């Protein structure tokens, strides 16, 4: 059986994140839990749960209760997770972490193509990143190559005439 490898918080990022981020990652590592396992207990997507750990997604009171119980962390130390997140400050721009840079590169290389196709399909507007869902899946093709499948689902918001 393959060993489960866990995502952890890099020390160089900790100062840019909320205090509860370190607490959550330490408890996650100690309990040997994946984001998938935590998400299953919370009834949330694993990307949303990871976003909570990085301070980019607001947690509900129920999320805090469940995290406290699952991770063995006092609720009081997680109480600020229900505050409004200060998004977009967790890393430098452009990104320097290779995987995150590849995602940035996808937008650099295909952003205008996405825009053109979306404008043709939906009209003049934008895809919301607020009324939004995302998912990450793993696929293995017929040749045995592993592929990452990232789904981005955002509500279409047409620009209004004023």
From Swiss-Prot:
Keywords: Lyase. The active site is at residues 102, 105, 128. It catalyses: cyanate + hydrogencarbonate + 3 H(+) = NH4(+) + 2 CO2. GO terms for biological process: cyanate metabolic process. GO terms for molecular function: cyanate hydratase activity; DNA binding. Its EC number is 4.2.1.104. It comes from the Eukaryota. Belongs to the cyanase family. Catalyzes the reaction of cyanate with bicarbonate to produce ammonia and carbon dioxide. This is Cyanate hydratase. The gene is CYN1.
């Amino acid at each position: 059986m393959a060993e489960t490898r866990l995502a952890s918080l890099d020390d160089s990022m900790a100062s840019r994140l909320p205090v509860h981020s370190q607490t959550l990652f330490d408890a996650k590592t100690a309990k040997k839990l994946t984001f998938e396992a935590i998400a299953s207990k919370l009834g949330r997507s694993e990307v949303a749960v990871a976003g909570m750990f990085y301070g980019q997604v607001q947690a509900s009171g129920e999320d805090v209760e469940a995290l406290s119980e699952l991770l063995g962390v006092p609720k009081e130390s997680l109480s600020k997770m229900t505050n409004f997140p200060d998004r977009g400050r967790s890393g430098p721009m452009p990104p320097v972490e290779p995987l995150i840079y590849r995602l940035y590169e996808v937008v650099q290389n295909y952003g205008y193509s996405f825009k053109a196709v979306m404008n043709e399909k939906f009209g003049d507007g934008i895809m919301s990143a607020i009324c939004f869902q995302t998912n990450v899946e793993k696929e293995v093709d017929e040749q045995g190559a592993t592929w990452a499948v990232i789904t981005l689902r955002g509500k279409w918001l047409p620009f209004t005439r004023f």
